[in-house]
Amino acid sequence: MIRVRTSLKKCDVSLGLRLISTTRTNPTTPTTPRKRRATVFKDTLNKGPSFEDFVSGRAAEVSLDPLERARSTVEENQRLPKWLKTPIPKGSNFHKLKEDVRDLKLSTVCEEARCPNIGDCWGGNDKSKATATIMLLGDTCTRGCRFCSVKTNRKPGAPDPMEPENTAEAISRWGLGYVVLTTVDRDDLIDGGSHHLAETVRKIKQKAPNTLVETLAGDFRGDFQAVDVMAQSGLDVYAHNLETVESLTPHVRDRRATYRQSLNVLKRAKQTVPTLVTKTSLMLGLGETHEEVIQTLRDLREIKCDVVTFGQYMRPTKRHMKVVEYVTPEKFEFWKEQALEMGFLYCASGPLVRSSYKAGEAFIENVLRKRKPLEQQQESLSAFRI
């Protein structure tokens, strides 16, 4: 019995060794490598610098994105050109407006965005020619654009229900000829705050019927219902800013804001109320090219945008993106001429121009006031036909 068991064990061991050896040396077994799915990291790595680029010292140049490449040519401590220096704001009108803003618990983009033109817009002697830009829906934005100094938070406080009434009261006190209502982005609200804005416009028109109202609103995440609510609120100018050219948009604006979405918002506002003046603004000095600015103007004319403004990007703090170029006043004048030649109704262009700067300038005011009687005539004719 012992001999039989020993021989069986020897057979088992030898059989096992044979099986192992045949498995290892079988040349017919297919060995197809498993294909890995593409990832953003993998795509970026494949498009990045090669080993030869690292050896030759070209790696940094190859890996830079367009915005960083433009910035790499900027001097770190370049001096502010003389045409960008402004006097300290002063004057009785300036201080009166500031006091009323505090008393009525209102926010202004003039202060929040540290606008260099606050003294010019608020401090003029003729109040009917002054322009104030009231910021509605609070002073905290749900988005974080890399050029903007307004506070950000995912969940800002609830909108003040008295804000439409208080804003209308302030406008009627000041006796302004033109007011701009702007707003932080409120992605936390279902309608993006469109009904709150529209109610403010209606209140102003009730208390100050001769005041022209412009709203500088966000993109409402591309929600056309919200755009329609704003366009039909009784406002005079519908403004929404592209901010920059298409290639720089992902680097400059919040990821939820896209170039095409902004164009569609302006297009929808015009389609909803064809007599509405539509307006947008572009910052220069971010690294944009001549051809890109021309293409942006073409895109705007294609959707029948009426007004465009150009201004110099100014870095609010060291935490924000750097200035690539200080554009000269002569170049701003060139862009103004280009815009007017392309058929824009009006163009404000200059180093210190902002989207709301001198919004009530005589030319655009005259255009709006001339349109009023025509609109009233059309309404009377349509009512007569009914």
From Swiss-Prot:
Pathway: Protein modification; protein lipoylation via endogenous pathway; protein N(6)-(lipoyl)lysine from octanoyl-[acyl-carrier-protein]: step 2/2. Its cofactor is [4Fe-4S] cluster. It comes from the Eukaryota. SMART domains: Elp3. GO terms for molecular function: 4 iron, 4 sulfur cluster binding; lipoate synthase activity; metal ion binding. Keywords: 4Fe-4S, Iron, Iron-sulfur, Metal-binding, Mitochondrion, S-adenosyl-L-methionine, Transferase. Pfam families: LIAS_N, Radical_SAM. GO terms for cellular component: mitochondrion. Binds 2 [4Fe-4S] clusters per subunit. One cluster is coordinated with 3 cysteines and an exchangeable S-adenosyl-L-methionine. [4Fe-4S] cluster 2 binds at C141, C145, C148. [4Fe-4S] cluster 1 binds at C110, C115, C121, S356. InterPro entries: Aldolase_TIM, Elp3/MiaA/NifB-like_rSAM, LIAS_N, Lipoyl_synth, rSAM. Its EC number is 2.8.1.8. The keyword Iron applies. It is found in: Mitochondrion. Residues 124-345 form the Radical SAM core domain. CDD domains: Radical_SAM. It catalyses: [[Fe-S] cluster scaffold protein carrying a second [4Fe-4S](2+) cluster] + N(6)-octanoyl-L-lysyl-[protein] + 2 oxidized [2Fe-2S]-[ferredoxin] + 2 S-adenosyl-L-methionine + 4 H(+) = [[Fe-S] cluster scaffold protein] + N(6)-[(R)-dihydrolipoyl]-L-lysyl-[protein] + 4 Fe(3+) + 2 hydrogen sulfide + 2 5'-deoxyadenosine + 2 L-methionine + 2 reduced [2Fe-2S]-[ferredoxin]. Belongs to the radical SAM superfamily. Lipoyl synthase family. This protein may be expected to contain an N-terminal transit peptide but none has been predicted. This is Lipoyl synthase, mitochondrial. It comes from Zygosaccharomyces rouxii (strain ATCC 2623 / CBS 732 / NBRC 1130 / NCYC 568 / NRRL Y-229).
